[in-house]
UniProtKB/Swiss-Prot annotation:
Component of the acetyl coenzyme A carboxylase (ACC) complex. First, biotin carboxylase catalyzes the carboxylation of biotin on its carrier protein (BCCP) and then the CO(2) group is transferred by the carboxyltransferase to acetyl-CoA to form malonyl-CoA. Belongs to the AccA family. GO terms for molecular function: acetyl-CoA carboxylase activity; ATP binding; carboxyl- or carbamoyltransferase activity. Acetyl-CoA carboxylase is a heterohexamer composed of biotin carboxyl carrier protein (AccB), biotin carboxylase (AccC) and two subunits each of ACCase subunit alpha (AccA) and ACCase subunit beta (AccD). One of its GO terms (biological process) is fatty acid biosynthetic process. PROSITE patterns: COA_CT_CTER (PS50989). This is Acetyl-coenzyme A carboxylase carboxyl transferase subunit alpha. The lineage of its organism: Bacteria, Pseudomonadati, Campylobacterota, Epsilonproteobacteria, Campylobacterales. It comes from the Bacteria.
Amino acid sequence: MASYLDFEKNIQQIDEDIINAQIKGDTEAVSILKKNLEKEISKTYKNLSDFQRLQLARHPDRPYALDYIELILNDAHEIHGDRAFRDDPAIVCFMGYLGEKKIIVIGEQKGRGTKDKIARNFGMPHPEGYRKALRVARLAEKFQIPILFLIDTPGAYPGIGAEERGQSEAIARNLYELSDLKIPTIAIVIGEGGSGGALAIGVADRLAMMKNSVFSVISPEGCAAILWNDPAKSEAATKVMKVTADDLKSQGLIDDVIDEPTNGAHRNKEAAAVAIADYVKKSLNELENIDVRELSANRMQKILKLGAYQEA
């Protein structure tokens, strides 16, 4: 059953009317309602606010990493474990083919349904998850296979156990090692890009965001609680924080914005997957013509240009 956000109520009503008309066998009404639905979708999604895009990034029906992996990879095989502590299901790693190209995909997985969400810790990786990602990234470098990172997390897990096992070290180690990989790397924010939890698999030659995704150092709710002592002001915080793909592209913090279907990735997963696959293929065609040592050097220069600072 489809889920709807507050600003999608008109779309929900038309969807329900279409179902009722189909049950009655009223083909003429179905045809008219489908045209009305297209108009309503176009109207609703034409001028989304930053807060509405945040809601879409968290939409319960939005495709997750495993959805895209299933849709874009052929002959996919999962790689488990960090070889030190355990296998963290919040991070998924697959080796397979994108078209005719070998590729490794490393993604953050939130989970669907209560049991799966709990098992995957709602997409909040533990340090062993990031260490698994790094282990697989090293394998990719060893066999000269490019990597696609799919970012979708509210943040790294802040629990006591995670801190005891070195959460900050695991994130820092990934930043250090991924910045110097001698293979082409692409990272795409497909939903939420939550702070260090996203950065830990977000160092890449190309960093892109889906149109309705967000990327920030803290959640808007957390920002509102700190600045105004009122989490309810998250809508205002979302606008101030500049978390959307277009905002980050205009500031030079990401390389590209990947357009979604008009009605959002959650209503057309297949089209969203095609958009991602096309972007990855195009990027790999460009990156594979660059010497791997030059790739690494360019990646480091890109990192050093981030932000603004003044030397003393």
